[in-house]
Structure formats: structure tokens, C-alpha cells
Design a protein with these regions (language model features):
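Phosphate-binding glycine-rich loops and their immediate beta-loop-alpha structural context
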Residues: 90-196
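Conserved RecA-like P-loop NTPase ATPase core
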Residues: 15, 163, 199, 203
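The start of beta-strands in P-loop NTPase/AAA+ ATPase cores
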Residues: 27, 158, 178, 212-214
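Phosphate-binding/switch loop-helix module in NTP-utilizing enzymes
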Residues: 194-215
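Short beta-alpha junctions and helix-cap segments that line functional grooves
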Residues: 31-34, 57-60, 88, 114-117, ...
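Short flexible coil/turn linkers enriched for glycine and charged/polar residues
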Residues: 8-13, 23-24, 41-45, 63-66, ...
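Phosphate-interacting basic helix/loop segments used at nucleotide- and nucleic-acid interfaces
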Residues: 1, 110-114, 199-204
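N-terminal "pre-motor" subdomain/linker immediately upstream of P-loop NTPase catalytic cores
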Residues: 1-83
Length: 215
């Protein structure tokens, strides 16, 4: 058996451990629905385990393109038993924001200071940046992201880029210290949808563990 780690993606009647990020890849690992139900696994879980690798000379199963998961070691960094007892996101209580995220960082960065003054952001708040093209939306997002990682290191930062240029993704990965999840414009629309959905599910699983997530 070979060790494996990734994000669980649950589809209609089967599941996969995405081993190369949030998008489907050739080295994904098949997980039976029986194993998912038995261990209380949920879509967006970060799992580790072992995969069965065909022996040398053994004919690969033509019907099963992906190697199956044969052992489950941990779910979201904890034991499988702990994962079974965790709360469900849908049953948690939504509250108005009551903890502020301070975005001011340095005297050179005026954008985040202006946001602090005009439209303060708190934990649990939704915000929208509306502007014409080439006005600097990406720069504002990078400034906000870097301010959160600096002033609120307890927050898990997720930056999801959908239908973006590949160079924009590289720029974001280099300038932001959080988790950058991307589906570039050369990928099919179905990939954009699945990346966005899986990223939301991942955020929910982190919240169930009591973590603060900013996305």
C-alpha cells in the first residue's frame, strides 16, 4: 500500500480523493460510498490514508481506472472517531459579525486603511468589490488578503480564482500567503463549478472544526 493525501470530493454514487489540488487529476484515488458512510466522511474533508497499487505484472482492472483507497488514517488532521462526532455546518448558528478584521498594515498601503475607515469588515461578513476592468480589483484583493494573514493569523485564508488568466493565478500565489485555489480560463465550465463548490465545502469542514475561514 502507498500513502496518499488529498481533498475528498463526493459525487452521486462514488467519491474521489483529489491528490493534485481541487481539480480532477490522473492520480486521484477512488473511495467507495460504503467507506464514506461508514467513516462519516464529508465532501471537502482533507484525508490521509493508503492506496492499493497493482503489483508488478498484475493486469490493471479495466473497469476501475483509479486505484482504490484501502486504509483511512486521518480526517482533517484528526482521528476518524473525532470526525464522526463533529457538528454539521447546516446546524450551526449564524450570527451577525461581532469581531473586526483590521486591514491597516503600513503607511504606504492606503487602500486597506480607507476600507477600515469607510467600510469596516468583520468575521462572518460578506463584501463585494464592484469596479470596471483594469481598475485594480486584484490589487485590492491582494492587499486585503495580506492584511488578514498579517493582522489575523488565526484565520485560514482561501483565495478562489475562477476563469482567470494563468499569469494572474501565479501572481496571486506569489503575493498571498494563504491557500490559492484556481481554475484557469482554458479549463471547461464544469471544472469552474466543481472547484468553486469543493472550495466552499472545504471551508465548511474547517468551520465545523471551530476555525475562522476567510474566502
Amino acid at each position: 500500500a502507498q500513502p496518499v493525501a488529498g481533498i475528498l470530493d463526493v459525487l452521486d454514487n462514488y467519491a474521489f480523493v483529489r491528490t493534485s489540488g481541487y481539480l480532477p487529476g490522473p492520480h486521484d484515488v477512488y473511495v467507495s460510498m460504503n467507506m464514506v458512510r461508514k467513516n462519516g466522511m464529508r465532501r471537502g474533508d482533507a484525508v490521509t490514508g493508503a492506496v492499493r497499487v497493482p503489483k508488478e505484472g498484475e493486469q490493471p482492472n479495466q473497469r476501475q481506472k483509479f486505484n482504490p483507497l484501502v486504509r483511512l488514517d486521518s480526517i482533517n488532521g484528526g482521528s476518524v472517531e473525532d470526525a464522526k462526532k463533529r457538528p454539521e455546518f447546516g446546524k450551526l448558528t449564524p450570527l451577525y459579525p461581532n469581531q473586526r478584521l483590521r486591514l491597516e498594515t503600513s503607511t504606504e498601503r492606503l487602500t486597506t486603511r480607507v476600507i477600515d475607515l469607510i467600510m469596516p469588515i468583520g468575521k462572518g461578513q460578506r463584501a463585494l468589490i464592484v469596479s470596471p476592468p483594469k481598475a485594480g480589483k486584484t490589487t485590492i484583493l491582494q492587499d486585503i488578503a495580506n492584511a488578514i494573514t498579517r493582522n489575523n493569523p488565526e484565520c485560514h485564508l482561501m483565495v478562489v480564482l475562477v476563469d482567470e488568466r494563468p499569469e494572474e493565478v501565479t501572481d496571486m500565489q506569489r503575493s498571498v500567503k494563504g491557500e490559492v485555489i484556481a481554475s484557469t480560463f482554458d479549463r471547461p465550465p464544469s471544472d469552474h463549478t466543481s472547484v468553486a463548490e469543493l472550495a466552499i465545502e472545504r471551508a465548511k469542514r474547517l468551520v465545523e472544526q471551530g476555525k475562522d475561514v476567510v474566502g
